From Swiss-Prot:
Record protein name field: Aspartate carbamoyltransferase catalytic subunit
Annotated L-aspartate binding sites: K87, R170, R224
Gene: pyrB
Organism, as annotated: Flavobacterium johnsoniae (strain ATCC 17061 / DSM 2064 / JCM 8514 / BCRC 14874 / CCUG 350202 / NBRC 14942 / NCIMB 11054 / UW101)
Function text: Catalyzes the condensation of carbamoyl phosphate and aspartate to form carbamoyl aspartate and inorganic phosphate, the committed step in the de novo pyrimidine nucleotide biosynthesis pathway.
NCBIfam families: asp_carb_tr (TIGR00670), PRK00856.1 (NF002032)
Catalytic activity: carbamoyl phosphate + L-aspartate = N-carbamoyl-L-aspartate + phosphate + H(+)
GO biological process: 'de novo' pyrimidine nucleobase biosynthetic process; 'de novo' UMP biosynthetic process; amino acid metabolic process
Domain of life of the native organism: Bacteria
């Protein structure tokens, strides 16, 4: 059986293209499984997984839990509000207490960049990064690339523009790593205040004009503005942002070409994209959600195989 080159999924920059291909091949199998009348397989009946979320999450947490249960793993979940970390306990002590209950794998979301990496060096369990601050969100990038592959046949050679709040987005960074690793060309588009200064050092081109970016691309991945990570105003108003960087149907129609619209969610309808665009044939947003379960099943299964 083929194996991943890593014992943890901490970020896209820690894996290679062979790992991505193996995850996609495994996800192809699980995509077929989750579309059967009986959507469960007994693959991980002897594995216990803890989902530890120190930041709020709806889609990602539900997707991980469903993926784990589809694999027949035992699952425990808790949020920071219920955690002893609130009482002063360290992250390592919290996780080691959980591991002492014979937990095999930890899926963690944390506000601090590098938290998952830090944990992997200090505890004896397989760690999956479900998002660490504005650093990485590897399973989101994997499901995004998988969705492009599903829609367009391949990721290699495709032109992808990531639009919006690049500065505060863990999705953007993981996507850049994953897309480039698979041979795609990447540009970013957004207000200058929301583009990191280092971005061009990653081999990414900045295109400040949305129309030009859309005329160039095959795929547009629309990111929301992450107001919860901002302590100052990065643009004059939401209305002005939507006028400059929002995608609506008249804009898409005027391009005279087919492009794929993606969004990691949650969508701010009328800001990044209008409802007409979100619900159109251009959009693969709900496909991304479905593919997220298959991708997370694949990641968990492959990492658990190394434990066993």
């Amino acid at each position: 059986m083929k194996e991943l080159s890593v014992d943890h999924l901490l970020g896209i920059k820690y894996i290679n293209e062979n790992d991505i291909n193996l995850i996609f091949e495994t996800a192809d199998h699980f995509k077929e499984v989750i579309n059967r009348p009986i959507k469960k397989v007994p693959s991980l009946r002897d594995i216990t997984i803890a989902n530890i979320f120190f930041e709020n999450s709806t889609r990602t947490k539900l997707s991980f839990e469903l993926a784990q249960k589809r694999l027949s793993a035992d699952v425990i979940s808790f949020s920071a509000a219920q955690s002893s970390v609130k009482k002063g306990e360290t992250l390592i002590d919290t996780v080691n207490n959980i591991l002492s209950m014979k937990v095999d794998m930890v899926v963690m979301r944390h506000s601090n960049p590098g938290a998952a990496y830090f944990l992997s060096k200090n505890v004896k369990a397989s760690i999956v990064n479900a998002g660490d601050g504005a650093h990485e969100h590897p399973t989101q990038a994997l499901l995004d690339s998988y969705s492009i592959r599903e829609k367009l046949g391949d990721v290699a050679g495709k032109k992808v523009v990531i639009v919006g709040d690049i500065l505060h987005s863990r999705v953007a960074l993981s996507n850049i790593y994953a897309l480039q690793m698979q041979g795609a060309e990447v540009k970013v588009c957004g207000p200058k205040t929301l583009i990191p200064r280092y971005i061009e050092s990653l081999g990414v081109t900045v295109e400040p004009n949305l129309r030009k970016a859309l005329e160039w691309c095959d795929v547009a991945n629309m990111l929301r503005v992450q107001n919860e990570r901002m302590d100052v105003n990065f643009f004059p108003s939401t209305r002005e942002y939507a006028q400059q960087y929002g995608v609506d149907k008249p804009l898409l129609d005027s391009l005279n070409k087919e492009i794929v619209i993606m969004h990691p969610g949650p969508i701010n309808r009328g800001v990044e994209i209008t409802s007409e665009v979100a619900d159109s044939d251009h959009s693969v947003i709900l496909n991304q959600v479905e593919n997220g379960v298959a991708i997370r099943m694949a990641v968990i299964y492959l990492l658990a195989s190394k434990i066993q």
